[in-house]
């Protein structure tokens, strides 16, 4: 079941297009979140596509300004300062952790941290980002399941999702089935049938790759 859950996570977070079972070797396949949000023509009606201002395209030097622009772009579509969630791959998460902590000088970079003298730990992670147009909870994406992208920063993809505008719909809930033992030992299988529902692609943001 754990492996099935990981397969589901990788499929939902993927960039693949949908496929319809045809009885001739093509299996049904849901459209991955990356394909829903890439703004490409033909995936969804033009009025509901993810705006270009909500996509940090490949090669973008990611900064706090760009993150704020993505959040503001989502706000312009929904009109609501929603609680958003950023599902970030490892490279993107580390870049965000350095927001407002590094400054460049002519000779060196200076890192600023808050340190409690009574504590033996220094916190460098960022779990919550508050902006003018929404509060973003930042969570780790499973590195085995996030889409493989190319950019200056390895593993730099992420999804800025609005929980009110997506869902997972199950046809067959996840479960296990035991098959009869015909003399070869115990056997069975686990299965699940579901699809990803993206109710408004414009209500989300997409970080494809960063440099």
Residue ranges and their predicted role:
Residues 1-5:
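Internal, well-ordered alpha/beta segment that forms a basic, Gly-enriched binding/recognition surface
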Residues 6, 25-65, 94-211:
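Sequence/fold signature of self-assembling virion shell proteins
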Residues 10-26:
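Short, glycine/acidic-rich hinge or "gate" loops at secondary-structure transitions
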Residues 83-91, 95-96:
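Long, repeat-rich segments with strong aromatic
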Residues 79-81:
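Short helix-terminating capping/connector loops at secondary-structure junctions
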Residues 60-77:
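A Trp-anchored, charged/polar loop motif used as the substrate-binding/catalytic surface
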